[in-house]
Amino acid sequence: MFELKKGALFVDEMKNVSIRIGKVVEEEEEVWEEAGPTPKPGILELRKWDHKLLERYEPFYAPMQDFCNLCTMGPCDLSMNKRGACGIDLKTAKARLVTIACCIGASAHTAHARHLVDHLIEEFGEDFPIDLGGDVNVEAPIIRTVVGIKPKTLGDLREALNWAEKEIVKVLHSTHIGNEESLLDYESKAMHVSMADHVGMEVADIAQIVAYNFPKAEPDTPLVDTGFGIVDKSKPTIVVVGHNVMYARPVADYLEEMGRIDDFELAGLCCTAHDMTRYNAKAKIFGPISYQLRVIRAGIPDVMISDEQCIRADLLEACKKMGIPLIATSDAAARGLPDVSDWPVEKIVDALVSGKLPGVFLPIPEKVGQVAPLVAEAIFKKHGGERKYKFFESDEALMEEINKCTQCMNCVFTCPHSLRVDQGMAHAQKTGDLSKLAQLEEQCLACMKCEQACPKNIKIINVIMRANYDRLYNKTGKTRVGRGPIQDTEIRKVGQPIVFGQIPGVIAAVGCINFPDEMKSIREILEEFLKRRYIVVTSGCHAMDIGMIKDEEGKTLYEKYPGNFDAGGLVNTGSCVANSHIAGAAIKIANIFAMRPLRGNYAEIADYVLNRVGAVGFSWGPYSHKAASIATGFNRLGVPVVVGPHGTKYRRAYIGKPWKKDKWWVYDIKSRQKVFIEPAPDSLLVAVETKEEAIVQLARLCIRPNDTNQGRQIKLTHYIELHQKYYGDLPDDWAVYVRSEADLPLKMRDQLLKVLEEQYGWKIDWDKKKIVEGPVRHFDAGFNPTIVEEVYEKYAGEKAPR
């Protein structure tokens, strides 16, 4: 370490000298933890860890096409083991596409973080302190583990962002034609850039929590209105859409300052809605991206404010058709609108209200806060609320639209879910009964592909929404406001039962709305685990989706289950960027419970999570590039992820091969031996077709090598019971997870011992009811697994065995 001394520099006689003062170091840096081996890692520093994962969980590719057209030497046919003009083969080409997708996702969150941090530093100063509440002492666990710094101020977050941005550029460079030729190294780069994505997310959410005073790790946050029919149509309605709350916040501030917050409806779509409710609990949530056209076509907004990410690319066109003024705010989506930053507020309001301009680009948050309420009130006075919640002017107009249909089935062929719109139309034409059309609404993504394909230009979405209007309007519920990080005290309480298996697992429901069936399936899947005392954490679109679905008693899951991070708890961390707190919780278990150091120590922490923390990510409706990078970042951390059937379109899965016995081993620090183990977890990324398959996979992937007898018994009980419930028999692979008779579910022990003896050839001592021979390995209470040689050497004090 260096010693700081006072000194002087005389510059009065210097010529042609430029002096720049960077970060001023006032005192020696606090040594909060010894630095690990990989602070601010580059592409290569964690490559060895990635290759260990990829050796066990081999990439499986499901290309949507067998050609490449990424450069002008193409398109190149890569089928039948052919190579392209640049020499690339099909698998490597798909690995490159996956890497590009992860780069896009990571850049979205990191650019969001950069925009937010720079703005907040300008507003609050770079010395504004990071305070996440008295119960969070291990703040920024991802930044600590990856970047190796302990951020104390907003200014410190720039250091983490500088690292993330550099790595994103380096990985994106590798995808240029004529670079990488190894699919495994592309996958390693995808993992690397996705880890940077997690850093970007953590920076963004920490910044907005501390600057905007969002809830700070509070389990019992307010419940807010969620769903289509949430707004009072007798009030002017301001609708925000996107993922950056920077531009929506001033609207709430302006209304509060004017004492008029109760005279307006302030509601949102997508993650800006989440973060608006974290800032002001009077805000409301319409829903995810699939509700954007629903809300616009119903004429609900009197003004719309768009920022960035997951917003329809025809938003302006859709708003123009309904006479809804649009204020675009983000440089990521200026939407071809004129920049009115220099205009006075009155001129902007007049241009929008008069219809001279259908929309404006206004990247100044404070002006947005003033303009939006004035425009909304003026537009509302024009129609008096009469246009709200109307898809057609009359029933006759609805039937006139339905009668245009000739059942050509173009809509069916283009629909992502192949919904039988033709049958619903035909039934309505013959009988006047809209029930078959109404049934389609629950599964409709409102993507508009059907309308594009229709030769009669039928407003199919309007028809479907109007057919199910009563149910759609009343599909309202409650979402618990995003709480942000998990408390250290919560981690301290659940760390041991999670690692030992007494809490059977953590299910992290994160992702988009591209569901294969009705939205209620996400509730059914998650409630199965809540009832079984798993911890369920959620964020983003999934978090708001489950706030819309009620049970027979009229309650949502948020109203039935507590918000604390404990067995049977349902935790909403917040928006997309709040996903970071879910990964952060896994990291904090390793640190707070197991005392593993975090600083620049990524591989050891990920190794700990893989072998001990029974957490599984779940994205039932994956759709975006951000979802791809979020999932891949979890994979690098050792957390498996289950995706719905549309997840196959990401083109790649990480699936282990249990029959390859030589792939399933660990170093046991206690016995100083290389030990062959059960395949747990046996996949890092896997797609499922049905909700039944999703439930069973999630339960199975919570099993970890480090489970105690009691923990394995609990996990096997749930796995077997769920398989029997949904498939009617025992799972094919249950026996590989049995290490001793104590692992077996108590009420089925005798039955299962008999099955092991008769069907699997195991030797059973029936007098003692003990397993004598058969398991892959026997249970050892001191078992201490790792797959990282350096971790073994660190704790065993010797070279790893061969």
From Swiss-Prot:
Q: Which residues bind CO?
A: H109
UniProt keyword Membrane, yes or no: no
Q: Which Pfam families match?
A: Fer4_8, Prismane
Catalytic activity annotated for this protein?
A: CO + 2 oxidized [2Fe-2S]-[ferredoxin] + H2O = 2 reduced [2Fe-2S]-[ferredoxin] + CO2 + 2 H(+)
Task: Cite the binding residues for [4Fe-4S] cluster 4.
Answer: C415, C444, C447, C450
**Cofactor(s) essential for the protein:** [4Fe-4S] cluster; [Ni-4Fe-4S] cluster
What role does this protein play? Answer: Part of the ACDS complex that catalyzes the reversible cleavage of acetyl-CoA, allowing autotrophic growth from CO(2). The alpha-epsilon subcomponent functions as a carbon monoxide dehydrogenase.
Q: How does it assemble?
A: Heterotetramer of two alpha and two epsilon subunits. The ACDS complex is made up of alpha, epsilon, beta, gamma and delta subunits with a probable stoichiometry of (alpha(2)epsilon(2))(4)-beta(8)-(gamma(1)delta(1))(8).
What is this protein identified as?
Acetyl-CoA decarbonylase/synthase complex subunit alpha 1
Lineage start: Archaea, Methanobacteriati, Methanobacteriota, Archaeoglobi, Archaeoglobales
Question: Which gene underlies this protein?
Answer: cdhA1
